[in-house]
Amino acid sequence: LQMESFDVIVVGAGIAGLTAARELLKKEPTLKVLVLEGKDRVGGRTLTVDVQTANHTSDKFDMGGQWVGRTQKELLALLDELKIELYDQYETGRKMAQLGTEKIRSYSASLPVFAAGSFTLYEVIDFVRNIFRMNRMSNKINVLDAFSWEGAVAADEQSVASFARSIALTRSARDALDIGMRAVYGAEAKRMSLLYHLLYCKSGGSFMDLIEATGDGAQAFRIKGGSQQISLKLAEALGSDRVRLRSGVKRVETSEGGPTRVTLENGDRLECKRLVLAIPPNQCGQVEFSPPLGYLKRRLYDNMTPGHLIKFVVTYKSAFWREDGKSGEIISAGRTTIPGEILPIVCSYDATTSNGSPAIVGFIHAELHDWTLNERCNAVVKDLVRFFGTKALAEFIAYEEKNWNKEPFNGGCPVDYVTPGNMDAFGTIRDMHYGVHFAGTETALVWMGYMSGAVESGKRAANEVLHALELREKVDHKYLKGSQFSVDYHHPHPPSDHYNDTISPWRRRIFFGCALVFGIYAVSKKYDLSYTARVFRPVEKSVFKWWTGSEWPH
């Protein structure tokens, strides 16, 4: 049988893959482009579902990526093109926190960092000191070349948790950082490379920008109707003939200058001039490559671990927390005085829709993965009662959750992260493998790990393909930054562990120190001085001579 042939095949019908296909056809409509998706839906790590709400109706809620930040320019531009509207994340009122103790504390500042009224001055100073130190370190990172920073090797050798323990003076500050890691990455701080975290912060602006819902924070806006409609609209514009669902890729055969052949899980074989893999790094590791990937890229995919967040939505008869003067925001360490006990909620936000359907959205600790759905539901509602009072149970309507760890062709959410000691491999994440290009939010330079990063990565991959197909007049070179086709591309520095043969200054210090002590001793013996005078008389003589120009009187 003759193999189906295409100019470009894109694997992955999430935001990155569909953006790549759209960009290619926008620049060159004559290209024969096909998008393959292993799941039975488009959207990747975005998923919008209907949940029962007040007044016996239902409304749409996001169970995957959902927030948009003011500085996420690529995503904002795409939303504008697709005529998708935004609305503000509600954050008015007191926020609830359980940090450093079982006691629940409330605060009105954007973050507990600035909540001097609810936390001790010592805790606030510790919060601020740690945040500013982390921001100062992340500002030194070059996103394109992490190991150009002199502190990179040491940062990659330690986890975020070990770093936090070395600088944080209070349990509250350590808890706050742990919660930030769980909410942003779906991972424990002890499992993540500090260097990766610093690079991720730099990509999004700062650590504060990753965790805030105000200002330039990543949680500033939500999408009317849900975020999955981005992919649905992109796929609709491409046409059903260009998007094939239930078409997981098993094997890729590629070569320099020759065609690339793709074998699907059902045995079908396709051929293309260029292939774009727009799937998470951990899923790239499930694909068999011929010839094999290089050592560093193979190690990258083996050691990039997906986050393990469980996301929940609880709908209510009314937004009672607003009536009580609360914003709906919770941050919780989930720890108690009982060894081994853990409470489910990591953080939560007001999830009331643009239609006015009251709800709370949040994330659950990974330790609850093996619990049943009913056990997690009961635990979450009980925990909401702990923060919001008995109305959290009395006005309960429905509970919905998404365990992304069980999602096929995904393996976790919201993002893949790098474990300590593997950031040298991360430098290859955008590198091509013969006729194969790589997209996905983890490959982005700006807002890595977010929907905006997915858009950017799709455009980069599309422009790489146009360049490779000799359609260079159609290439937008600003999207080739970080690509091997960039005019100013240079391979990232490898981690340096070389010997430093400079002479230690301590040799000179010890020599001159000994000479000084011997001189003082010799003078004191000659003039038979007291112990105090033996120390100070030579100094007095020197100062006297320098000041007066005369010798010390005998």
Label every model-predicted segment.
Residues 4-35:
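N-terminal Rossmann-like FAD-binding beta1-loop-alpha1 element of flavoenzymes
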Residues 19, 27, 259, 308, ...:
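Conserved flavin/dinucleotide-binding core of flavoenzymes
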Residues 25-54:
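Glycine-rich FAD pyrophosphate-binding loop
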Residues 56-139, 149-150:
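Dinucleotide-binding Rossmann-like beta1-alpha1 core, especially the glycine-rich loop
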Residues 58-68, 144-154, 216-224, 297-305, ...:
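Active-site rim elements
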Residues 139-248, 255-260, 278, 283, ...:
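Active-site/ligand-binding neighborhood in enzyme catalytic cores
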Residues 247-248, 253-328:
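Central helical "cap/lid" subdomain
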